[in-house]
Amino acid sequence: MNSDLKSFDKIEQKIGGSRKISNYIIGGMLTIGGIGFLLASISSYTGRDLLPLGNPSTLLFIPQGIIMGAYGVIANLLNFYLWYLVYINFGSGSNYFDKSSKSIEIRRKGLFKDIEVKLNFDEIKSVKLDISEGFNPRRRIALVLKGRKKPLPLSGAGELKPLLQVEEEGARLAKFLDVNLEGLK
Protein backbone atom coordinates (compact mmCIF):
# COMPACT_ATOMS: atom_id res chain seq x y z
CA MET A 1 0.00 0.00 0.00
CA ASN A 2 1.05 3.61 -0.42
CA SER A 3 2.66 5.43 2.50
CA ASP A 4 0.35 8.48 2.55
CA LEU A 5 -3.10 7.48 1.38
CA LYS A 6 -4.75 10.84 2.14
CA SER A 7 -2.96 12.40 -0.83
CA PHE A 8 -4.19 9.77 -3.28
CA ASP A 9 -7.69 9.34 -4.69
CA LYS A 10 -7.50 5.62 -5.45
CA ILE A 11 -6.12 2.50 -3.81
CA GLU A 12 -5.87 -0.91 -5.42
CA GLN A 13 -4.75 -3.91 -3.38
CA LYS A 14 -3.94 -7.23 -5.03
CA ILE A 15 -4.93 -10.34 -3.08
CA GLY A 16 -3.09 -13.62 -3.58
CA GLY A 17 -5.06 -16.79 -4.05
CA SER A 18 -4.38 -20.49 -3.78
CA ARG A 19 -1.17 -20.47 -5.84
CA LYS A 20 1.09 -20.89 -2.83
CA ILE A 21 4.17 -23.05 -2.46
CA SER A 22 2.44 -25.05 0.30
CA ASN A 23 -0.40 -26.03 -2.06
CA TYR A 24 2.11 -27.17 -4.69
CA ILE A 25 3.95 -29.29 -2.12
CA ILE A 26 0.74 -30.85 -0.75
CA GLY A 27 -0.55 -31.42 -4.28
CA GLY A 28 2.67 -33.15 -5.28
CA MET A 29 2.61 -35.39 -2.21
CA LEU A 30 -1.06 -36.27 -2.82
CA THR A 31 -0.32 -37.07 -6.46
CA ILE A 32 2.57 -39.40 -5.62
CA GLY A 33 0.73 -41.02 -2.71
CA GLY A 34 -2.56 -41.49 -4.55
CA ILE A 35 -0.93 -43.02 -7.62
CA GLY A 36 1.24 -45.20 -5.37
CA PHE A 37 -1.76 -46.57 -3.48
CA LEU A 38 -3.65 -47.25 -6.72
CA LEU A 39 -0.64 -49.04 -8.23
CA ALA A 40 -0.24 -51.12 -5.05
CA SER A 41 -3.92 -52.09 -5.25
CA ILE A 42 -3.65 -53.04 -8.93
CA SER A 43 -0.44 -54.98 -8.18
CA SER A 44 -2.16 -57.00 -5.47
CA TYR A 45 -5.04 -57.78 -7.87
CA THR A 46 -2.93 -58.74 -10.91
CA GLY A 47 -0.04 -60.36 -9.03
CA ARG A 48 2.56 -58.23 -10.90
CA ASP A 49 4.73 -55.58 -9.26
CA LEU A 50 3.92 -52.17 -10.74
CA LEU A 51 5.89 -50.24 -8.11
CA PRO A 52 9.70 -50.06 -8.08
CA LEU A 53 9.82 -50.32 -4.28
CA GLY A 54 8.40 -53.07 -2.12
CA ASN A 55 6.57 -56.15 -3.24
CA PRO A 56 2.87 -55.23 -3.40
CA SER A 57 2.00 -58.24 -5.56
CA THR A 58 2.24 -60.45 -2.45
CA LEU A 59 -0.52 -58.52 -0.68
CA LEU A 60 -3.92 -60.15 -0.50
CA PHE A 61 -6.38 -58.28 -2.67
CA ILE A 62 -9.08 -58.71 -0.04
CA PRO A 63 -8.83 -56.74 2.29
CA GLN A 64 -5.43 -54.97 1.82
CA GLY A 65 -5.67 -54.36 -1.94
CA ILE A 66 -9.21 -53.00 -1.78
CA ILE A 67 -8.37 -50.68 1.12
CA MET A 68 -5.26 -49.39 -0.67
CA GLY A 69 -7.35 -48.83 -3.79
CA ALA A 70 -9.90 -46.86 -1.77
CA TYR A 71 -7.10 -44.74 -0.28
CA GLY A 72 -5.75 -44.14 -3.78
CA VAL A 73 -9.15 -43.07 -5.13
CA ILE A 74 -9.76 -40.72 -2.18
CA ALA A 75 -6.26 -39.22 -2.49
CA ASN A 76 -6.70 -38.67 -6.22
CA LEU A 77 -10.11 -37.02 -5.73
CA LEU A 78 -8.61 -34.64 -3.16
CA ASN A 79 -5.65 -34.18 -5.49
CA PHE A 80 -7.90 -33.24 -8.42
CA TYR A 81 -9.80 -30.75 -6.26
CA LEU A 82 -6.61 -29.12 -4.94
CA TRP A 83 -5.03 -28.83 -8.39
CA TYR A 84 -8.28 -27.33 -9.72
CA LEU A 85 -8.19 -24.67 -6.95
CA VAL A 86 -4.55 -23.92 -7.80
CA TYR A 87 -5.36 -23.77 -11.53
CA ILE A 88 -8.16 -21.21 -11.13
CA ASN A 89 -6.20 -19.39 -8.38
CA PHE A 90 -9.15 -19.61 -5.99
CA GLY A 91 -9.48 -16.65 -3.63
CA SER A 92 -7.34 -14.25 -5.66
CA GLY A 93 -8.65 -10.83 -6.49
CA SER A 94 -8.41 -7.18 -5.63
CA ASN A 95 -9.75 -4.44 -3.37
CA TYR A 96 -10.35 -1.14 -5.13
CA PHE A 97 -11.11 2.08 -3.24
CA ASP A 98 -12.01 5.26 -5.16
CA LYS A 99 -12.27 8.45 -3.11
CA SER A 100 -13.60 10.64 -5.94
CA SER A 101 -16.65 8.43 -6.57
CA LYS A 102 -16.74 7.21 -2.91
CA SER A 103 -16.99 3.62 -4.08
CA ILE A 104 -15.40 0.33 -3.08
CA GLU A 105 -15.12 -2.76 -5.28
CA ILE A 106 -14.02 -6.08 -3.81
CA ARG A 107 -13.38 -8.87 -6.33
CA ARG A 108 -12.49 -12.50 -5.62
CA LYS A 109 -12.12 -15.58 -7.79
CA GLY A 110 -14.74 -18.10 -6.65
CA LEU A 111 -15.02 -21.82 -7.27
CA PHE A 112 -17.34 -21.59 -10.28
CA LYS A 113 -17.77 -17.85 -10.77
CA ASP A 114 -16.18 -14.55 -9.83
CA ILE A 115 -17.49 -12.73 -6.77
CA GLU A 116 -17.84 -8.95 -6.88
CA VAL A 117 -19.06 -6.69 -4.07
CA LYS A 118 -19.69 -2.98 -4.67
CA LEU A 119 -20.12 -0.59 -1.74
CA ASN A 120 -20.25 3.14 -1.05
CA PHE A 121 -18.14 4.89 1.58
CA ASP A 122 -21.27 5.79 3.58
CA GLU A 123 -22.04 2.07 4.09
CA ILE A 124 -18.79 1.63 6.05
CA LYS A 125 -19.01 1.88 9.82
CA SER A 126 -15.33 1.22 10.60
CA VAL A 127 -12.19 -0.72 9.69
CA LYS A 128 -11.58 -3.67 12.00
CA LEU A 129 -8.35 -5.49 12.73
CA ASP A 130 -9.08 -9.14 13.46
CA ILE A 131 -5.99 -10.35 15.29
CA SER A 132 -5.73 -13.63 17.17
CA GLU A 133 -2.53 -15.36 18.21
CA GLY A 134 -1.96 -18.93 19.31
CA PHE A 135 -2.17 -22.28 17.54
CA ASN A 136 -4.05 -20.90 14.52
CA PRO A 137 -3.05 -17.23 14.28
CA ARG A 138 -5.12 -14.79 12.22
CA ARG A 139 -4.24 -11.25 11.23
CA ARG A 140 -6.63 -9.66 8.82
CA ILE A 141 -8.25 -6.36 7.97
CA ALA A 142 -12.03 -6.21 7.57
CA LEU A 143 -14.70 -3.62 6.88
CA VAL A 144 -17.52 -3.31 9.40
CA LEU A 145 -20.66 -2.41 7.48
CA LYS A 146 -23.72 -0.62 8.80
CA GLY A 147 -26.58 -3.06 9.32
CA ARG A 148 -24.41 -6.17 9.02
CA LYS A 149 -23.17 -8.21 11.96
CA LYS A 150 -20.19 -9.93 10.34
CA PRO A 151 -17.28 -7.84 9.06
CA LEU A 152 -16.28 -8.13 5.39
CA PRO A 153 -12.66 -9.38 5.19
CA LEU A 154 -10.27 -7.56 2.88
CA SER A 155 -7.11 -9.63 3.25
CA GLY A 156 -6.66 -13.05 1.69
CA ALA A 157 -7.28 -16.30 3.53
CA GLY A 158 -4.20 -17.82 5.09
CA GLU A 159 -2.23 -14.62 4.57
CA LEU A 160 -0.16 -14.04 7.71
CA LYS A 161 1.52 -10.62 7.56
CA PRO A 162 3.63 -9.18 10.37
CA LEU A 163 1.53 -7.57 13.10
CA LEU A 164 3.04 -4.10 12.61
CA GLN A 165 2.30 -4.18 8.87
CA VAL A 166 -1.34 -5.18 9.46
CA GLU A 167 -1.78 -2.39 12.02
CA GLU A 168 -0.22 0.20 9.68
CA GLU A 169 -2.32 -0.89 6.69
CA GLY A 170 -5.49 -0.85 8.81
CA ALA A 171 -4.71 2.63 10.16
CA ARG A 172 -3.96 3.98 6.67
CA LEU A 173 -7.15 2.50 5.26
CA ALA A 174 -9.26 3.89 8.12
CA LYS A 175 -7.68 7.30 7.55
CA PHE A 176 -8.33 7.07 3.80
CA LEU A 177 -11.98 6.07 4.32
CA ASP A 178 -12.33 8.59 7.18
CA VAL A 179 -13.75 6.00 9.61
CA ASN A 180 -12.72 4.59 12.99
CA LEU A 181 -10.25 1.75 13.48
CA GLU A 182 -11.39 -1.14 15.72
CA GLY A 183 -9.54 -4.07 17.16
CA LEU A 184 -6.41 -2.47 18.63
CA LYS A 185 -5.86 -3.30 22.28
Swiss-Prot record:
GO terms for biological process: photosynthesis. Its main location: membrane. Keywords: Membrane, Photosynthesis, Thylakoid, Transmembrane, Transmembrane helix. One of its GO terms (cellular component) is plasma membrane-derived thylakoid membrane. Pfam families: Ycf4. The chain crosses the membrane at residues 24-44, 66-86. It is found in: Cellular thylakoid membrane. It is a multi-pass membrane protein. This is Photosystem I assembly protein Ycf4. The gene is ycf4. The lineage of its organism: Bacteria, Bacillati, Cyanobacteriota, Cyanophyceae, Synechococcales. It comes from the Bacteria. Seems to be required for the assembly of the photosystem I complex. Belongs to the Ycf4 family.
